[in-house]
């Protein structure tokens, strides 16, 4: 894919709640010119393609269709949302055994089509499945990207914005680490319109320290709350994936919190994909943005990475999984 290519094509693998929400966001925002949808349920993909096409007269021209893996050969971006859903009370990491096998099959099919673009992974546990997509594809790490903590960071900014009465676009704050239970807030660099959050709160006592702790917990556990109430989360992640797609297709060099490969950017954190800010453009990850972490934050990053690394090592100790490795 090049930054000058005018016709941009997405292949979406997984037409469940998240995949459908992402497809709808692409149509609404006019991102890309072609969208092929792959799922084991062909009736579903055909129905979604037809339904989405009926919105085009109100939005932007686009070719939308039920696709086969062979259609990925000339795609610019393959988005992976396929996998078994997270059940109430189930952690994202408990999904790993089941979804790794699904991921291996899908990635193999996509690569065999001749695909040579960028993988964007959203299936959970996303950090583990981004790693496995990299291993199974043999692609450069820059062209395998996970949605990471993009949604978590958006939730964090929105929660802070609501608490202090400021537009979320003027609140700059990141969640880093695993997209899941071991994620953490980078309080040391959170700011409101360039003013450090702690300094802002000295002059505007909208929330105390315990309130900040409670706010983070609500952000971390937001998915569980939503799943318990409606069965799944999909609108937020659908829009987050559309935002990442736009940054790639428009060669924005935007800084977004994504699941990216760790090669020692942070002491003690290596050979995992994990959430941190990164510059993203037409060719994938330009480079990670290594925010200086406080000692406490670095310890949380290391602990989060270790948890992911232990799960990855256990999974790839399975000969059937290891047999598919290309990287």
From Swiss-Prot:
Cystine bridges: none
CDD domains assigned to the protein according to its UniProt record, in alphabetical order: HicDH_like
Keyword vocabulary terms for this entry: Allosteric enzyme, Cytoplasm, NAD, Oxidoreductase, Phosphoprotein
InterPro entries linked: L-lactate/malate_DH, L-lactate_DH, L-lactate_DH_AS, Lactate/malate_DH_C, Lactate/malate_DH_N, Lactate_DH/Glyco_Ohase_4_C, NAD(P)-bd_dom_sf
GO cellular component: cytoplasm
GO MF annotation terms: L-lactate dehydrogenase activity
Reactions it catalyzes: (S)-lactate + NAD(+) = pyruvate + NADH + H(+)
Principal subcellular localization: cytoplasm
Pfam families tied to this protein: Ldh_1_C (PF02866), Ldh_1_N (PF00056)
Positions that bind substrate: 86, 92, 124-127, 152-155, 233
Residues annotated with Phosphotyrosine modification: 224
SUPFAM superfamilies on file: LDH C-terminal domain-like, NAD(P)-binding Rossmann-fold domains
Entry's family note: Belongs to the LDH/MDH superfamily. LDH family.
Protein name in the entry: L-lactate dehydrogenase
Lineage, highest ranks first: Bacteria, Bacillati, Bacillota, Bacilli, Lactobacillales
Gene: ldh
């Amino acid at each position: 894919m090049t930054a000058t290519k005018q016709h941009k094509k997405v292949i979406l693998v997984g037409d469940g709640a998240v995949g459908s929400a992402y497809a709808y966001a692409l149509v609404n925002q006019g991102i890309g010119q072609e969208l092929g949808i792959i799922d084991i349920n062909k009736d579903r993909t055909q129905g979604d393609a037809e339904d989405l096409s009926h919105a085009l007269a109100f939005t932007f021209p686009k070719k939308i269709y039920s696709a086969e893996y062979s259609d990925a050969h000339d795609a610019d971006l393959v988005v992976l949302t396929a996998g078994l859903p997270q059940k109430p009370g189930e952690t994202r990491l408990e999904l790993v055994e089941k979804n790794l096998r699904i991921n291996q099959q899908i990635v193999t099919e996509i690569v065999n089509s001749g695909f040579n673009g960028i993988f964007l992974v959203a299936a959970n546990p996303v950090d583990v499945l981004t790693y496995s997509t990299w291993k199974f594809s043999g692609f450069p790490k820059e062209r395998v990207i996970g949605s990471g903590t993009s949604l978590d960071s958006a939730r964090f900014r929105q929660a802070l914005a609501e608490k202090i009465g400021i537009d979320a676009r003027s609140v700059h704050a990141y969640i880093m680490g695993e997209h899941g239970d071991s994620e953490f807030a980078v309080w040391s660099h959170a700011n409101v319109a360039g003013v450090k959050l702690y300094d802002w709160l000295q002059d505007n006592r909208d929330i105390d320290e315990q309130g900040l702790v409670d706010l983070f917990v609500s952000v971390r556990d937001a998915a569980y709350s939503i799943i318990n109430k409606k069965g799944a989360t999909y609108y937020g992640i659908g829009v987050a994936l559309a935002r990442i797609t736009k940054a790639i297709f428009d060669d924005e060099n935007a800084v977004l919190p994504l699941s990216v490969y760790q090669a020692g950017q942070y002491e003690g954190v290596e050979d995992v994909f994990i959430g941190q800010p990164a510059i993203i453009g037409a060719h994938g990850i330009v480079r990670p943005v290594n925010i200086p972490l406080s000692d406490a934050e670095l310890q949380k990053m290391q602990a989060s990475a270790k948890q992911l690394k232990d799960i990855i090592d256990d999974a790839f100790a399975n000969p059937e999984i290891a047999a598919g490795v290309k990287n």
